[in-house]
Amino acid sequence: MRAHQGIIKIPLEAKTKPDVIKELVDVLKKAGKIEDAESVFRAVMLRENMGSTGLEKGIAVPHAKTHKVNNLVLAIGVSPEGIDFDSLDGEPSKLFFLLIATPQQAGPHIEALSEIARLTRSSNFCKLLLNAKTPKEIVEIFSAQ
């Protein structure tokens, strides 16, 4: 999984689940990865309404499939204080991986979700991300994996 500085927001300013998603969608728009931010936001919120993507141990992976992207895109956000994301363990989420794919990209979408799960199983990896102060540091952490 490749990360570059343009898709990373650290720290997130959002305080609510919808605001986190909006902020990360805006990151993708500014990075030139999507054009129709509102439609992408709605697709992610629709998916969230089906079941929260707040996992455990401070990890959230909001994701959706929509025709409003041309390929698989990722945005990363860090909130050191944490945000209520309706997580499975009831704890605030601190690391956010927003993943958007086309409906035809089921395979790559699942592979990306699996890669995020693999990386975030490492408490050291998560600790490094949480201690990062800049997008550049996050890119370096991903590059070392």
Question: Residue locations for each model-derived region?
Answer:
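Cytosolic covalent-transfer regions centered on His/Cys nucleophiles
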Residues: 1-145
